């Protein structure tokens, strides 16, 4: 909670200590690090110990989950010949970005233990730089995955991107993540500072200057609006294409007086259109879950009522991004048929059981007459 007295923000009594002491946020920072604490945070009492404990436990779980899930993706996709396809390089790149984000978690755990950013300005810059590169890189990689799926499924013969094209897209994802990560690092435009419980760092969205407002607007469009628009457009066009394709097949089957032209049609299978919609919705919602909280907090902090941005509220976006980086490998890769087959073969103790490829699919390619429901559900069987 945030209050203002006659002379400005005042600290709350830290009830968690039970001794009536008054401790504002940042009081535990060493004297040489006090300049890092934005005046906004000093208007709040120190967070209760159980808040820190809750986030501490959550970050440990997320860190272990991210290392395991993304580590499996990188290991399987990089060592399996059947998975070394152009499209799968994008999934591998996403796992690398997600694992890169995980490198911040040990730093956070140390910060939460001592109560301040270990390493001072340099430690804060490194933490925020890692988060910026991995976050913006993952967002644009998600957009390129959506674009690749649209190209592949809408035109399975000539629409597949080549190795060279995919490598260029991957290089572009790292270039895309660089400008708005490096500019605040050198304080050319924007800057990094502690946020929330003052144990994490991000770009400054609290300083009310015209220059900083322009920075927040620009990074919002760059890291959120553009990738989200690309994802939405790609999956909308993909969904539209599949719907038209299924309608055409249904009309042709009616003319030929047969039930269906799809090679894999049966009463137990979910319709292709529904599976496409479900997969697209999951992917799109994950992106929104990851970046909408940060966008909302940053926009409110820069243009709205800053008193709404409490330490607890500003910690939620950080938790959301870390959570999605752990979910990505399961959404993007665990539903990949050939990936599941590799897991079943190499790690049978995971209990994964995947239907083996049938003769109806040659080399993992979709037939011209039909599109595999599993392929459309999440990933082309490359």
Curated annotation (Swiss-Prot):
The chain crosses the membrane at residues 50-76, 89-112, 128-147, 166-190, 215-242, 279-302, 311-335. It is found in: Cell projection, Rhabdomere membrane. Expressed specifically in the retina. Each Drosophila eye is composed of 800 facets or ommatidia. Each ommatidium contains 8 photoreceptor cells (R1-R8), the R1 to R6 cells are outer cells, while R7 and R8 are inner cells. Rh5 is expressed only in R8 photoreceptor cells in a subset of ommatidia. GO terms for cellular component: membrane; plasma membrane; rhabdomere; rhabdomere membrane. Residues 1-49, 113-127, 191-214, 303-310 are extracellular. Residues 358-382 have a biased composition (Polar residues). Residues 77-88, 148-165, 243-278, 336-382 are cytoplasmic. Keywords: Cell membrane, Cell projection, Chromophore, Disulfide bond, G-protein coupled receptor, Glycoprotein, Membrane, Phosphoprotein, Photoreceptor protein, Receptor, Retinal protein, Sensory transduction, Transducer, Transmembrane, Transmembrane helix, Vision. GO terms for molecular function: G protein-coupled photoreceptor activity. The modification N6-(retinylidene)lysine is found at residue 322. The keyword Lipid metabolism does not apply. Visual pigments are the light-absorbing molecules that mediate vision. They consist of an apoprotein, opsin, covalently linked to cis-retinal. PANTHER family: OPSIN. This is Opsin Rh5. It comes from Drosophila melanogaster. The gene is Rh5.
């Amino acid at each position: 909670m945030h209050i203002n007295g006659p002379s400005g923000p005042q600290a709350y009594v830290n009830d968690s200590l039970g001794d009536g002491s008054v401790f504002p946020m940042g009081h535990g920072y060493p004297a040489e690090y006090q300049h890092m604490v934005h005046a906004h945070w000093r208007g709040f009492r120190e967070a209760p110990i159980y808040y820190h404990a809750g986030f501490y436990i959550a970050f440990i779980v997320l860190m272990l989950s991210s290392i395991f899930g993304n580590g499996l993706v990188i290991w399987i996709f990089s060592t399996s010949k059947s998975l070394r396809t152009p499209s799968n390089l994008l999934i591998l790149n996403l796992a690398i970005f997600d694992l890169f984000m995980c490198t911040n978690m040990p730093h956070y755990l140390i910060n939460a233990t001592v109560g301040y950013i270990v390493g001072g300005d340099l430690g804060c810059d490194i933490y925020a730089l890692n988060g910026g590169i991995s976050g913006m890189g993952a967002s644009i990689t998600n957009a390129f995955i959506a674009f690749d799926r649209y190209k592949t499924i809408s035109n399975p013969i000539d629409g597949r991107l080549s190795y060279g094209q995919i490598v260029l897209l991957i290089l572009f994802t790292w270039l895309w993540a660089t400008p708005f990560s490096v500019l605040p690092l050198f304080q050319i435009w924007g800057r990094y500072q502690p946020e929330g419980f003052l144990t994490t760092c991000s770009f400054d969205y609290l300083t009310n200057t015209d220059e900083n407002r322009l920075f927040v607007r620009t990074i919002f469009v760059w890291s959120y609006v553009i990738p989200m628009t690309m994802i939405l457009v790609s999956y909308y066009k993909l969904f539209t294409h599949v719907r038209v394709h299924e309608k055409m097949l249904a009309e042709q089957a009616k003319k030929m007086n047969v039930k269906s032209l799809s090679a894999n049609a049966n009463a137990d299978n979910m319709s292709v259109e529904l599976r496409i919609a479900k997969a697209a919705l999951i992917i799109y919602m994950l992106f929104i879950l990851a970046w909408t909280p940060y966008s909302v907090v940053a926009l409110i902090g820069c243009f709205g009522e800053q008193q709404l941005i409490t330490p607890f509220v500003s910690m939620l976006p950080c938790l959301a991004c870390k959570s999605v980086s752990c979910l990505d490998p399961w959404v993007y890769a665990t539903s990949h048929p050939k990936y599941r087959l590799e897991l079943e073969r190499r790690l049978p103790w995971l209990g994964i059981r995947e239907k083996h490829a049938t003769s109806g699919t040659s080399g993992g390619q979709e037939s011209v007459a039909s599109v595999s429901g599993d392929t459309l559900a999440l990933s082309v069987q490359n």
